[in-house]
Amino acid sequence: MVEDSQDTTHFGFQTVAKEQKADMVAQVFHSVAAKYDVMNDLMSFGIHRLWKRFTIDCSGVRRGQKVLDLAGGTGDLTAKFSRLVGESGKVVLADINDSMLKMGREKLRNIGIVGNVEYVQANAEALPFPDNTFDCITISFGLRNVTDKEKALRSMFRVLKPGGRLLVLEFSKPVFEPLNKAYDAYSFHILPRVGELVAKDAGSYRYLAESIRMHPDQETLKAMMNDAGFENVNYYNMTGGIVALHRGYKF
């Protein structure tokens, strides 16, 4: 049992040692990698594609720019950014999990996306890039899995160019109480069953539901981004606040 609360963190509803969380999260994503895209469509009824499209639209990414798609997984955002930045630009798809990174690389190469995409296994808390490297950073449904979110946000701030922007797309807190109750019922009762049927892994999708509940709400995450140095931070609620897109700038 860990007694020092400064050395513990949350893994879903469990309290675990900080040094254990990364390995526990890694096991979740090793387990779900092969069925990740299928489960995304099933879990969100395909709406995740609209959330990601809105993120792309809010990114302001242009031809020739350099983008970091952090926790990029199977590369949905990277595919879009690759076309936007063109041959003169670059997209780095980074993920801490090698199984997810492998799935992303194979998926993008199979649809002909090569040349301006680089793949890097990286921890968001200690990004292996020089200061002032990227015009835009996105992290999509990944921040809640990070052990030290404040450290990760500071790391993202460091590698952004002045004038660059960070976009955090993440599950958040529904703004309507009836929706909140229905969402809880879906997340804790239906979602694990779907995970068991499709991915043969109810436990990983139970963790998903729990990790969403433990993630900071909209205003708390906004304050965390401000504390990390970002300015003009705002957010957009989507699907009643089930998901929120936060955007902040480095000036």
UniProtKB/Swiss-Prot annotation:
EC category name: transferase
Family of the protein in this entry: Belongs to the class I-like SAM-binding methyltransferase superfamily. MenG/UbiE family.
Signal peptide limits: none
Keywords from the named record: Menaquinone biosynthesis, Methyltransferase, S-adenosyl-L-methionine, Transferase, Ubiquinone biosynthesis
Family annotation (Gene3D superfamilies): Vaccinia Virus protein VP39
Sequence positions that bind S-adenosyl-L-methionine: T74, D95, N123, A124, S140
Gene name tied to this protein: ubiE
Organism: Cronobacter sakazakii (strain ATCC BAA-894)
GO BP terms: aerobic respiration; menaquinone biosynthetic process; methylation
Function: Methyltransferase required for the conversion of demethylmenaquinol (DMKH2) to menaquinol (MKH2) and the conversion of 2-polyprenyl-6-methoxy-1,4-benzoquinol (DDMQH2) to 2-polyprenyl-3-methyl-6-methoxy-1,4-benzoquinol (DMQH2).
EC number of the protein: 2.1.1.163, 2.1.1.201
Name of one Pfam family that matches: Ubie_methyltran
Record pathway: Quinol/quinone metabolism; menaquinone biosynthesis; menaquinol from 1,4-dihydroxy-2-naphthoate: step 2/2; Cofactor biosynthesis; ubiquinone biosynthesis
MF terms in GO: 2-methoxy-6-polyprenyl-1,4-benzoquinol methyltransferase activity; demethylmenaquinone methyltransferase activity
SUPFAM superfamilies to which the protein is assigned, alphabetical: S-adenosyl-L-methionine-dependent methyltransferases
Protein name: Ubiquinone/menaquinone biosynthesis C-methyltransferase UbiE
Catalysed conversion reaction: a 2-demethylmenaquinol + S-adenosyl-L-methionine = a menaquinol + S-adenosyl-L-homocysteine + H(+); a 2-methoxy-6-(all-trans-polyprenyl)benzene-1,4-diol + S-adenosyl-L-methionine = a 5-methoxy-2-methyl-3-(all-trans-polyprenyl)benzene-1,4-diol + S-adenosyl-L-homocysteine + H(+)
